[in-house]
Amino acid sequence: MKVLHICTTDGGGAGLCALRIHEAMLKQGIDSKVLVLIKKNDRNDVIRFCYLRRLLWRSINRMLRMLHLEITDYNYVTNLNINTGQCFTLPDTIYDVSQHPLVKDADVIHLQWVNGFIDYGTFFKKVKKPIIWTQHDENLFLGI
């Protein structure tokens, strides 16, 4: 069985939890891999997704925010977070994780903290594999 753990980052609580589950599966002889958007460590078994696209997207949005232009929902939510001290997230992203070779090769997908990484609207329509989603907080149903 091939299991793919998807997490926005391999740092922080959910990322570390994903790594612990990944390591436990490897010890049991399960073919386990980890796919992240933001890679915080130098482990070879953690694969970073499309770094250049993320860098370009963040740079463009940073410039738009500096010009006080809320052209995208991402910029609106970012400004809302800064101005209110709250932490809201969006269920859509620019990333199409469903087409990644690791997703296509996996038998089971294990989602951890996927804020800003998984585009809910397209991912669940395109991926027709068993999905396990570990909820580390209320983001899934509240967006915070």
Identify the role of each PLM range:
Residues 1-53, 104, 127:
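N-terminal subdomain of nucleotide-sugar transferases
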Residues 16, 20, 24, 28, ...:
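Metal-centered catalytic cores of metalloenzymes
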Residues 6, 13, 17, 109-121:
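Conserved beta-strand->loop/alpha-helix structural units within folded catalytic cores of enzymes
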Residues 107-110, 124-144:
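Active-site proximal beta-strand in glycosyltransferases
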Residues 8, 38, 113-114, 137:
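Short, well-ordered beta-to-alpha junction loops that form the rim of enzyme active sites
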Residues 65-117:
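Conserved nucleotide-sugar donor-binding subdomain of glycosyltransferases
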Residues 12-14, 41-45, 117-120, 139-144:
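Short catalytic/ligand-binding loop motif for oxyanion handling, primarily in non-cytosolic enzymes
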Residues 41-72:
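Conserved nucleotide-sugar phosphate-binding/catalytic loop shared by glycosyltransferases and other
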